[in-house]
């Protein structure tokens, strides 16, 4: 499954971020 790049909304699923960080609801690099 593809991950989401920084700046992408991730809600409560930080594991879907390419950077694995979600703060607070957006993937961060």
Curated annotation (Swiss-Prot):
Keyword annotations: Amidation, Disulfide bond, Hydroxylation, Ion channel impairing toxin, Knottin, Neurotoxin, Presynaptic neurotoxin, Secreted, Toxin, Voltage-gated sodium channel impairing toxin
Role: Delta-conotoxins bind to site 6 of voltage-gated sodium channels (Nav) and inhibit the inactivation process.
Residues carrying Glycine amide: 29
Similarity comment: Belongs to the conotoxin O1 superfamily.
Domain of life according to the entry: Eukaryota
GO CC terms, sorted: extracellular region; host cell presynaptic membrane
Protein name: Delta-conotoxin-like EVIB
Organism: Conus ermineus
Modified residues (4-hydroxyproline): 5-6, 14
Disulfide partners: 3-18, 10-22, 17-27
Subcellular location, record wording: Secreted
Domain remark text: The presence of a 'disulfide through disulfide knot' structurally defines this protein as a knottin. The cysteine framework is VI/VII (C-C-CC-C-C).
Tissue: Expressed by the venom duct.
Molecular function via GO: sodium channel inhibitor activity; toxin activity
């Amino acid at each position: 499954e593809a991950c989401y790049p920084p700046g992408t909304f991730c809600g409560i699923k930080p594991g879907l971020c390419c950077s694995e960080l979600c703060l607070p609801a957006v993937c961060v690099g």
